[in-house]
């Protein structure tokens, strides 16, 4: 009986991969999967009514609370950078530094974007930066697929340090009550990953600019807002520096960075001005990630249900899963394309069930599993996949086809993912 139920679970898992790849509404898909797997778990004797009532559909979303707070604060911080003029000033300086070299200007804008998203988070922050960056890139004659692709890959480049996303992933990949702790070991890898990821962007820009000559004289004036003092431009990386050097937690780090931003940009002249700015940016920041939070809360229901039925799936899949860490990292690197369209290698989709199965079958620690699963999410899902909201926005804003966007970015994303899986094996599993 349990073998039959395990096969049914596997069929529903494959059906969900197909559903996610269409793409369809994932929030509803995750809810239906949680219902299905809970029901099958009841038949298999691994799930009780108490589990359904308390652990899956109540404990899943409510247990996500701390991570939701991190996401909201990351999104708010992104809005602070835009509203205070810090983001605009950094971008303007990058354009001036690039001079009459469109390719260099594109690379500098990508670097600025990557640094901003080491701390900022959310679709709203991406859009707010994108509406400044894209007109500059396009006015320089940079091809639209390259402008959209390099920008989206730059957003993903910063996410190796981004505590909003790192904590989001840690919450999703919890084993029981245990979560992966983001510490010095991860930050050492993040520095290497950032460098390799950004190098892939540079190579992508250089190769595409050779094929498509752009001219600096095509540049048009773009309003990026007021100038702020040079010291204020340290704000985007301040929370990361505080976390690495002084072990300051995410929320205090962001609060200190916000205070620093307000003081250095001259926004502390009156209490009412501070109140208006903080209130507006916080409201906008929460609005920006509302749907993201909804999706992630339904994902938690699915995660909890997957955890309850892992005993039915593990006996079927365990014999075919590699028991070698090197082979597992190698396979994830070779098949990272399966993170596309919420497939089996992204935890923000069908890959959540695979994580539960791999964790149960191998017994490997989170210190190994976390980088194994995070890399394809960060290099493929957040950078390139059209199901990621900000990627789809960039494609629409620049008016490029999904096909051209993918042709420009996917080869570099896949190579980057493979290299990073090999690096992660050396740093976390050897």
Each model region followed by its residue ranges:
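N-terminal alpha-helical transmembrane segments of multi-pass membrane transport
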Residues: 1-73, 79-91, 95, 101-102, ...
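Membrane-interfacial loop-to-helix junctions in multi-pass transporters
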Residues: 3-6, 61-68, 94-109, 140-147, ...
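Alpha-helical transmembrane segments
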Residues: 63-71, 184-198, 247-255, 367-379
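Hydrophobic alpha-helical transmembrane segments of multi-pass integral membrane proteins
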Residues: 70-73, 100-134, 322-367, 374-379
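Membrane-core helix-loop-helix motifs of multi-pass transport proteins
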Residues: 134-228, 390-430
């Amino acid at each position: 009986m349990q073998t039959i139920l395990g096969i049914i679970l596997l069929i529903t898992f494959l059906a969900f991969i197909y559903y996610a790849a269409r793409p369809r509404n994932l929030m509803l898909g995750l809810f239906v999967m949680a219902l299905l797997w809970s029901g099958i778990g009841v038949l298999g004797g691994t799930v009780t009514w108490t589990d359904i009532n308390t652990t899956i559909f109540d404990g899943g979303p409510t247990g996500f609370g701390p991570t939701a707070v991190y996401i909201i604060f990351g999104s708010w911080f992104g809005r602070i950078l835009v509203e205070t003029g810090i983001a605009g000033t950094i971008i303007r300086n990058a354009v001036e530094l690039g001079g009459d070299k469109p390719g260099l200007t594109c690379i500098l804008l990508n670097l600025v974007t990557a640094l901003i998203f080491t701390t900022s988070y959310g679709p709203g922050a991406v859009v707010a930066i994108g509406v400044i960056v894209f007109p500059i890139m396009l006015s320089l004659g940079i091809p639209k697929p390259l402008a959209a692709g390099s920008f989206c890959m730059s957003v993903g480049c910063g996410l190796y340090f981004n505590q909003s996303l790192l904590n989001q992933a840690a919450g999703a990949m919890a084993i029981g009550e245990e979560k992966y702790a983001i510490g010095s070991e991860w930050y050492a890898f993040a520095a290497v990953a950032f460098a390799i990821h950004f190098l892939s962007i540079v190579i992508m820009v250089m190769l595409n600019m050779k094929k498509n000559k752009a001219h600096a004289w095509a540049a048009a004036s773009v309003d990026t807002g007021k100038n702020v003092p040079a010291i204020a431009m340290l704000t985007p990386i301040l929370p990361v520096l505080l976390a690495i050097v002084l072990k300051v937690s995410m929320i205090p780090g962001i609060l200190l960075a916000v205070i620093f931003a307000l003081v250095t940009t001259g926004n502390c002249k009156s209490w009412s001005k501070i109140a208006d700015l903080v209130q507006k940016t916080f409201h906008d920041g929460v609005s920006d990630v509302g749907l993201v939070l909804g999706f992630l809360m339904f994902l938690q229901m699915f995660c909890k249900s997957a955890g309850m039925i892992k005993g039915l799936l593990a006996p079927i899949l365990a014999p075919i899963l590699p028991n070698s860490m090197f082979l597992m990292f190698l396979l994830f690197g070779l098949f990272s394309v399966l993170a596309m369209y919420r497939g089996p290698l992204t935890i923000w989709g069908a890959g959540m069930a695979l994580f539960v199965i791999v964790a149960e079958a191998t017994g490997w620690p989170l210190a190994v599993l976390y980088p194994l699963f995070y890399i394809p999410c960060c290099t493929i899902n957040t950078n390139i996949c059209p199901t990621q909201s900000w990627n789809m926005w960039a494609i629409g804003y620049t008016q490029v086809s999904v096909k051209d966007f993918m042709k420009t970015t996917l080869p570099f994303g896949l190579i980057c993912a493979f290299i990073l899986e090999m690096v992660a094996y050396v740093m976390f599993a050897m």
